[in-house]
Amino acid sequence: MKVRASVRKICINCRLIRRKRKIMVICSNPKHKQRQG
C-alpha cells in the first residue's frame, strides 16, 4: 500500500474508489494499491 498525496491509475485494471472520504486505488496487481494520505 502506497500512501501518496496524488493517487492515479497506473494500469488498465486499476480502479479509483472512495472509502470513508479517502480516495483509494485497487488493482489486480498488489503493487498498484494506493491511498491518499
Swiss-Prot record:
Pfam families in the record: Ribosomal_L36 (PF00444)
Keyword Nucleotide-binding: no
Molecular function per GO: structural constituent of ribosome
SUPFAM superfamilies in alphabetical order: Ribosomal protein L36 (SSF57840)
Domain of life: Eukaryota
Subcellular location: Plastid, Chloroplast
Annotated InterPro entries: Ribosomal_bL36 (IPR000473), Ribosomal_bL36_sp (IPR035977)
Record keywords: Chloroplast, Plastid, Ribonucleoprotein, Ribosomal protein
CC per GO annotation: chloroplast; ribonucleoprotein complex; ribosome
Coiled coil region boundaries: none
Chief subcellular location: plastid
GO biological process: translation
Family: Belongs to the bacterial ribosomal protein bL36 family.
Listed name of the protein: Large ribosomal subunit protein bL36c
Species of origin: Pleurastrum terricola
